[in-house]
């Protein structure tokens, strides 16, 4: 495992890289108030893949959000695209936990040509039942 750094439009984005550099590309996105190290326990299970786990701006070893910006959800999407571009990855599998999963889902919807697949852990997603069952399920809950 090695530390990596990318120059995004809003600042320096730090991260960790591990696995097989010749393997399928996977960009790992952590949850709110977390960092790239949260993916270290998964490293042995992903050894055949080229994993880059980033610290989103304002988290871990990455830069703070610069003046004039805030922690807007959409801005992190641009940061993720900056990292994919810096890596030279036209496409990648996205692995997201919590906030990272929500970001991965929105990126897949907005830029599907960049996303090979999604693996989401405790993330937002569509309910696994028909929409007309939603009211009854909420009442039951």
Predicted regions: what they are:
Residues 46, 111-112:
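Active-site catalytic pocket residues across diverse enzymes, especially alpha/beta-hydrolases
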Residues 14-64:
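Conserved HGGG/HGGXW glycine-rich cap/lid loop of the alpha/beta-hydrolase fold
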Residues 34, 58, 101, 125-126:
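Active-site micro-motifs of SAM-dependent methyltransferase domains
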Residues 1-26, 47-50, 89-90, 116, ...:
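Alpha/beta-hydrolase fold catalytic core
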Residues 105-110, 116-141:
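Flexible "cap/lid" loop of the alpha/beta hydrolase fold
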Residues 6-9, 16, 53-95, 99:
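Active-site loop/oxyanion-hole signature of alpha/beta-hydrolase fold enzymes
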Residues 26-29, 52, 94-95, 104-109:
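A generic "structured core" feature
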């Amino acid at each position: 495992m090695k530390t990596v750094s990318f120059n995004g439009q809003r600042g320096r984005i730090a991260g960790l890289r591990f696995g097989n550099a010749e393997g399928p590309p996977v960009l790992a996105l952590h949850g709110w108030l977390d960092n790239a190290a949260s993916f270290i326990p998964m490293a042995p299970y992903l050894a055949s893949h080229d994993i880059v786990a980033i610290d989103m701006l304002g988290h871990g070893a990455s830069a703070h959000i610069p003046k004039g910006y805030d922690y807007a959800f959409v801005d992190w999407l641009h940061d993720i695209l900056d990292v994919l571009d810096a890596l030279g990855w036209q496409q990648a599998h996205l692995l997201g936990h919590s906030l990272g999963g929500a970001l991965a889902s929105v990126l897949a919807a907005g830029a599907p040509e960049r996303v090979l697949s999604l693996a989401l852990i405790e993330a937002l997603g569509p309910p696994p039942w028909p929409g007309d069952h939603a009211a009854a399920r909420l009442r039951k809950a």
